[in-house]
Amino acid sequence: MKKHIRTLSVVPLAALAVSVCALYPTKTEIFTREPTDYKNAAVRLTAPSEPDTSAENITDPKSAVLDKVLNTIDRLDHVCMTARTNMIGDGETTLTFNVDISAGLSHQSVAENGVTVSETYSDTNMGMVSIDHRTKRYTPDCLPVYTRSDTPYIPLDERITYEDGIPCYRYRRNITNCPLASYCLVPQELAFSVLSDTGSWEMSDEPVIHPDTGRSCVVITGVPSDYFAAKHGIDSFSMSVDEETGVILSFEGKKNGDVVIFTYATEFDTATETPVGRFDAAAFADYTPTAR
């Protein structure tokens, strides 16, 4: 997948606000999973230049939902989440996130077939450490870490703009510091991919209860763009959006009514202040540290 970018305001990989494993690349290989709907999209990353705000006064229901999905980080602090997805590897992957944004701590684990294959620990004071259990290696300071002060709110009309007919997307930094949070917890990429055209989807009139988490959510159904449909082999999609936070509790891409791609949350808790684990090098004495 080779893409060229027309405009890019921030170029160093270490400075990117989104994870290198995110599901939404633009015209560069910044993101390694999924391409955007729009082949010619450019990406913007916001520098910390203004205080954080929120847009609670959006009156259009669809725009309000889109804004909420793009800004989950404003409504999250303590969060524990587990989700299953087939959008990362060849099979099903289980993602677990434990985050305390105020404390600057997070832990992400990735499991395949019930076996944890990788972990990421983040501490805004100490940096981020990535652990690969398959190779028994760990990498200190594998990615930069961010706090709330690094990512001001961006008004919705500035998130998606067009230059010569080419859509340009502005991202906020992923302050959960979990590299795979883009699949559900900080789903900016997915929002840009399937929700930016508000004429292509509809949402439920009344909230429904998500069966696995018990959360009140909005159900969205729609038709993907031609590019997104061709990439994933789907002709429709549906998702459940947590009404309070905008987090994606489920996403399904379907072909002729059959599910092709999915992400399903099995746990989502924002009320319990679960202690977040920290990296302890002594626990990995038989692992090999590698340079970034």
What is each stretch, according to the model?
Residues 153-204:
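Solvent-exposed helix/loop surface patches that form functional interfaces
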Residues 122:
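Detector for the Zn2+-coordinating histidines of canonical Cys2His2
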Residues 40-44, 56-59, 175-183, 224-229:
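A broad, low-specificity signal for short, low-complexity segments enriched in glycine/proline
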